[in-house]
Every structure is written in structure tokens, then in C-alpha cells.
């Protein structure tokens, strides 16, 4: 059985880790980096770039460079959060036929899981290059506050990338696993504050250690799936745009190229202000008008950035209060605070968290790598390589059905340990009702319409009876991935209907299979392209080497051989520009055969050179005079 790898599929950056013996190891990608930007670009010549190469070309290709796709995964186009992104993203977000938020790139419609799969493929390849064997299984992390549709969409992305997703685990829980891996932690309560690129989570976790066995029990979780570093960047971008408009009278929001340059500069300035008190945003030739080119040069202080994002940091603290309350704990009950996610490097975030908990957060957990390492630990647990670890996670939101009067009746309340199963008996609202619609909801509001609809199904064939008489047993079953299975059974007739909740949104099986096939086809075409490039390089080297040998052979090469070689070289150069690998290989062979005489001459010259060298060496030896000598020691 191969390794089960751990993947942190992040909004801004992604990371992959494996278990190496008893330690989790983060792997470097092909660029030599331990994290990979979650950026995907589709170039004009049909190439798909992922990570740093995609980020590098974003300025010149903003409409076809996709980032922060995790914010759209499992979302409806009309969701308030999706609409916020529609307004600010340089790429095109559209409504799919089923109402989901999809993307349009070069007139092609794409689902967010399909795009995220490109990042997962890069993670998979990174692990395969390190291990030297195929990788087919993974544990993928998601924000703790992801709903059912978002979790399902993440699993779909894994399948499209050619991975069997053995488990979906919550990011803060993964960070806790990484924290406890090499430590004698004893019994502790920890708070994991996870502020990433696009999402925020807080989890209160109890670690119990008995006879070396560690149990990680999530007591409560809360969060905001649309709050993260991207929002901090947006505040900085808006400030810079407004300042430039005040100064130059030009609104850069209408210029996608300028906005992409500005996005990079804003992110860089934000990072610099974590260690410096002031930075310059200097962008020459940012735009131009009738009077000529315009340059941006704006000083930004740390205090200014803090004033721009103060409300975002405060917004993150409300879920922290709720999580503590749900766990039935006070601030003094928390032993350790762990910060996860790149945005927690901001001093203001660290200070607000430290002030709230009354203690400094731990500095020995890498905020960028802890989640992937924890996912690798869970992979090790599932593979049987890691013993003595038990993980008890929770469902982040209440689950229930719509009942009479448009009310949500919860069957499983939030922060229930998973996996779990719960049944409740309901009845009909009308006399002689022959069918009921089970409308499944997720959320904390009493009014059904204010919660997230996960889907609905009908149970028909109910025997005619006065209202309130039939007994319909509804069962909710949440698996270890946090994904819901629902069944409804009429106790009288025995008729049963069951579904795995795949929201009215989401990809159907046919779409997933098509995307899997597309991904496989792309992998095949990528492999063929790589082989073609290798053969072209081989042809190029052969042409260069042959020309050099012809020159060195001079008059020793018969004229007819020289003509044949030059003709074969010209033929090879011509086909090397084409796409036919077999044709290039055939012309390489033709040149090798035509160069037989040339090879013979080259070998003769090499032998002659070797003989001459040997003669010179012997002559030098003859000139050597043997001398006797004795060692004279210095007098001390």
C-alpha cells in the first residue's frame, strides 16, 4: 500500500507533507519551495501553469489567471460572498446552469473543483517525485467552518486530480495534530486560531494523554469562510487606488493590468509591514493619460495598514467568543494558543489574540506548514503507520429539516462529535397526504429560509391517513469527513428513500467523470509534450555537434559524405520545428547514419591525439634526471 499524503489546499498557498517514520515531512515542489501559490493560469498557447510560474505571468494575463478559488468552491452564484468576489476579481465569475458560481476562461466554463484539481495535481506530482512511486490516496484539509457543499466540492476536486480522498479533516484540527506529534503534551486545552488567505477558523481542542496514547477532542469550532488575507489585501489595494486617484485624478479600477500589478505590490507591502514600520509602494508606469506616463509612489506605515484592517481583526474575535462559550470554557481554561495561516504573522493580529487570551501565542508551530503536517499525521493514522492517536472532530453547523410553518428543526446540533447518527419521527401536515418532501438544511437560524439548503428529496407512497397519523422516521448520518447521508422511512408501509446529500448545487457524477477524463487527457498530452521537447532538444544537440565535427574534419571528410550530412542536418532542422515526434526521431537516425564516415574520422583523430600524447609523455620521462638527496633537519 502506497503512502497517504497530507494536503493543505489553501486559498493563497498550498502545501503537501508525508509521514517519514514518526515525523511529518513537508515536501519541496519543483521550484524548490515548501509552499505553492494556489494560482492557476491558462496561457494563450493552451498551456496550464500552476503555482509560481502562474503567479509570475499574472500581470500580463490577469483575466486568465485564477486565484483564491477556494472562496468559490461549493458556493451558489447568488451567495453574498460570491457576489463580493464577482465585484473585485479580475477574472470572470459566472452562474452555472445549476446556479453554482463557476468561472469562465477563454470562453470555456469551469467549475471551481476542476480548477482546484490543478493545484492538487501539482501536490500529487511533488509527492510522487519525492517518493519515486505513484500516489493515489490523500487526506485533504478544509476550513472547520466549511459546510457540506464545500466539503463535497473539495472531495470532487481530489477525484478530478486522480486522488482517492481517504479523509477530509478540519484545518485547525490538523494543526493540533502537528502540534502534539513530537511533544509530551499531557492533558491540555488548546485554541487554534487559523486566519488564512481566504477563511478564518477557531477551534477549541482538548488533548488527553494516557499511557502514551493521545486523544484530540474538538470541543467547539466556529469561523467565517469569507474572511482572510485576501480581504486585508483588498483594503490595502482600495487605499492605494483612492490615494492615486486623489493625486492624479485617474481611477485604476478600470485597468485590469494596473490592478494586477497593484495586487502584487499591496500583498508585498502588507508582508513587509509585519517587520518594518513603513514601506514604499513604488510602481513606475502604472498607467498613462494624454499628458504622458504616470507613476505610483506612496508611503504606507504600519499604523495606516492597521487602521485599514482593524475591523477585520475585530470581526475574527466574535467567533472566538462563541467557540469558547459553546465549549463551556473561559479564557483561563486555555493552556496554549496556536496561530495558523500566513495572515497571523501580522503583529496586530498576534497582539489582539494575545490580549484576548491573556497569554502569548506559541511561536514553535510553523503557521504555513502545520496544517499539511497534521494532514500527513492523519494519513499515517489511516494507513496504520501512526499508532496511539485518536481524533474526535465535530460538525461545525447544526443540521435539520424544514418543518411546518417554514421552521428549521435540528436533528444534529453544531459541535456534535462525528461520525454520528440521529433519528427523529415526523408526520404529515395534511389529511391523506401521499408524499412528503424532506428539505435538508444546515445553519443556526430558526427560519428555514435563512439557512443553507443542502438539497431535498421526496418520500412517496405514504398510505392515506388523517394528518399527524403516519410516522416518518428521518435519520441523519454524518460520516468522518463531515458529509451527510439522509434517509426517510414510512414506518407503516416500510417504504424508504435515502440520499447522500449533494446539494442542489455541486457537480453530478457525470460531470465529475468528464472532468476526471479531461484531467487524464491533459496529463497524457502533457507527457507527450514533454517527450516532444526532449526529442527536439536531442535533435538540436545532434545538429550542433555534427556541424562542429564537420568543421574539425575539414578536408579529411569526402565531399559526397559532407553533402549527405548537410542535407540530413537541413532535413532534421526542418522537422524539429514540427509536432511529429516519430518524424523527428526518424530524421535523427538518418543523420546518425549519414555521419558514419564523420564518426570514423573523429575516432581516428582521437586515437592519433592519444598516441601523440603518449609519445610526448615518454620523451618528458627520458629528460628526467634521477637525484639522490638526504633530509637535513634544522637545528633547534
UniProtKB/Swiss-Prot annotation:
> Which terms in the Gene Ontology molecular function aspect does this entry carry?
ATP binding; ATP-dependent protein folding chaperone; unfolded protein binding
CDD domains in UniProt: ASKHA_NBD_HSP70_DnaK-like
Phosphothreonine found at: 199
A Pfam family:
HSP70
Domain of life, per lineage: Bacteria
What triggers expression? By stress conditions e.g. heat shock.
The family database entries (InterPro entries) matched by this protein are listed as:
ATPase_NBD, Chaperone_DnaK, Heat_shock_70_CS, HSP70_C_sf, HSP70_peptide-bd_sf, Hsp_70_fam
Which stretches are tagged as biased composition: Low complexity? 604-615
Give UniProt keywords alphabetically: ATP-binding, Chaperone, Nucleotide-binding, Phosphoprotein, Stress response
* Region annotation (Disordered) ranges: 604-636
Q: What does this protein do?
A: Acts as a chaperone.
Xref: NCBIfam families: PRK00290.1 (NF001413), PRK05183.1 (NF003520), prok_dnaK (TIGR02350)
Q: By its UniProt entry, which PANTHER family does this protein fall under?
A: HEAT SHOCK PROTEIN 70KDA
Family recorded in the similarity comment: Belongs to the heat shock protein 70 family.
This chain's protein is named Chaperone protein DnaK
Give the species: Photorhabdus laumondii subsp. laumondii (strain DSM 15139 / CIP 105565 / TT01)
Amino acid at each position: 500500500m502506497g503512502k497517504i499524503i497530507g494536503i493543505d489546499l489553501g486559498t493563497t498557498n498550498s502545501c503537501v507533507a508525508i509521514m517519514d517514520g514518526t515525523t511529518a515531512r513537508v515536501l519541496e515542489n519543483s521550484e524548490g519551495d515548501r509552499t505553492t501559490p494556489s494560482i492557476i493560469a491558462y496561457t494563450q498557447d493552451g498551456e496550464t501553469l500552476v503555482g509560481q510560474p502562474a503567479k509570475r505571468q499574472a500581470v500580463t494575463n490577469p483575466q486568465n489567471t485564477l486565484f483564491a478559488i477556494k472562496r468559490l468552491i461549493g458556493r451558489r452564484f447568488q451567495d453574498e460572498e460570491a457576489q463580493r468576489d464577482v465585484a473585485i476579481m479580475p477574472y470572470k465569475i459566472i452562474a452555472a446552469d445549476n446556479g453554482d458560481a463557476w468561472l469562465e476562461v477563454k470562453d470555456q466554463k469551469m467549475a471551481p473543483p476542476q480548477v482546484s484539481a490543478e493545484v492538487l495535481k501539482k501536490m500529487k506530482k511533488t509527492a510522487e517525485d519525492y517518493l519515486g512511486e505513484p500516489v493515489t490516496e490523500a487526506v485533504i484539509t478544509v476550513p472547520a467552518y466549511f459546510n457540506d457543499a464545500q466539503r463535497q466540492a473539495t472531495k470532487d476536486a481530489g477525484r478530478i486530480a486522480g486522488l482517492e480522498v481517504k479523509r477530509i479533516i478540519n484545518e485547525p484540527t490538523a494543526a493540533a495534530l502537528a502540534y502534539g506529534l513530537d511533544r509530551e503534551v499531557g492533558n491540555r486545552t488548546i485554541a487554534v486560531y487559523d486566519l488564512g488567505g481566504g477563511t478564518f477558523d477557531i477551534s477549541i481542542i482538548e488533548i488527553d494523554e494516557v499511557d502514551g496514547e493521545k486523544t484530540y477532542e474538538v470541543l467547539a469550532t466556529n469561523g467565517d469562510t469569507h474572511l482572510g488575507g485576501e480581504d486585508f489585501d483588498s483594503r490595502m489595494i482600495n487605499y492605494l487606488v483612492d490615494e492615486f486617484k486623489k493625486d492624479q485624478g485617474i481611477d485604476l479600477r478600470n485597468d485590469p493590468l494596473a490592478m494586477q500589478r497593484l495586487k502584487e505590490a499591496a500583498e508585498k507591502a502588507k508582508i513587509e509591514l509585519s517587520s518594518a514600520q513603513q514601506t514604499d509602494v513604488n510602481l513606475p508606469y502604472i498607467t498613462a493619460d494624454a499628458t504622458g506616463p504616470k507613476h505610483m509612489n506612496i508611503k504606507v506605515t504600519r499604523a495606516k495598514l492597521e487602521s485599514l484592517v482593524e475591523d477585520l481583526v475585530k470581526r475574527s474575535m466574535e467567533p472566538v467568543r462563541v467557540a469558547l462559550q459553546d465549549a463551556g470554557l473561559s479564557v483561563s481554561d486555555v493552556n496554549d494558543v496556536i496561530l495558523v495561516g500566513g495572515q497571523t504573522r501580522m503583529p496586530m493580529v498576534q497582539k489582539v489574540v494575545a490580549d484576548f487570551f491573556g497569554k502569548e501565542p506559541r511561536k514553535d508551530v510553523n503557521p504555513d506548514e502545520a496544517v499539511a503536517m497534521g494532514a500527513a499525521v492523519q494519513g499515517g493514522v489511516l494507513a496504520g503507520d501512526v499508532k496511539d492517536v485518536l481524533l474526535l472532530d465535530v460538525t461545525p453547523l447544526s443540521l435539520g429539516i424544514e418543518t411546518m410553518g417554514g421552521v428549521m428543526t435540528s436533528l444534529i446540533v453544531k459541535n456534535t462529535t462525528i461520525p454520528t447518527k440521529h433519528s427523529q419521527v415526523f408526520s404529515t401536515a395534511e389529511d391523506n397526504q401521499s408524499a412528503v418532501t424532506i428539505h435538508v438544511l444546515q445553519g443556526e437560524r430558526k427560519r428555514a429560509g435563512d439557512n443553507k439548503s443542502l438539497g431535498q428529496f421526496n418520500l412517496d407512497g405514504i398510505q392515506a391517513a388523517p394528518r399527524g397519523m403516519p410516522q416518518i422516521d428521518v435519520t441523519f448520518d454524518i460520516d468522518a469527513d463531515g458529509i451527510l447521508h439522509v434517509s426517510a422511512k414510512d414506518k407503516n408501509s416500510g417504504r424508504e428513500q435515502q440520499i447522500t446529500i449533494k446539494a442542489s448545487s455541486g457537480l453530478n457524477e457525470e460531470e465529475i467523470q468528464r472532468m476526471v477524463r479531461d484531467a487524464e487527457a491533459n496529463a497524457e498530452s502533457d507527457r507527450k509534450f514533454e517527450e516532444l521537447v526532449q526529442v527536439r532538444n536531442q535533435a538540436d544537440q545532434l545538429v550542433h555537434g555534427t556541424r562542429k565535427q564537420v568543421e574539425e574534419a575539414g578536408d579529411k571528410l569526402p565531399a559526397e559524405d559532407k553533402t549527405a550530412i548537410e542535407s540530413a542536418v537541413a532535413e532534421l532542422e526542418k522537422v524539429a520545428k514540427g509536432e511529429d515526434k516519430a518524424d523527428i526521431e526518424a530524421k535523427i537516425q538518418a543523420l546518425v547514419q549519414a555521419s558514419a564516415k564523420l564518426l570514423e574520422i573523429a575516432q581516428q583523430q582521437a586515437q592519433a591525439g592519444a598516441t601523440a600524447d603518449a609519445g610526448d609523455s615518454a620523451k618528458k620521462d627520458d629528460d628526467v634526471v634521477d637525484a639522490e638527496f638526504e633530509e637535513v633537519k634544522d637545528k633547534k
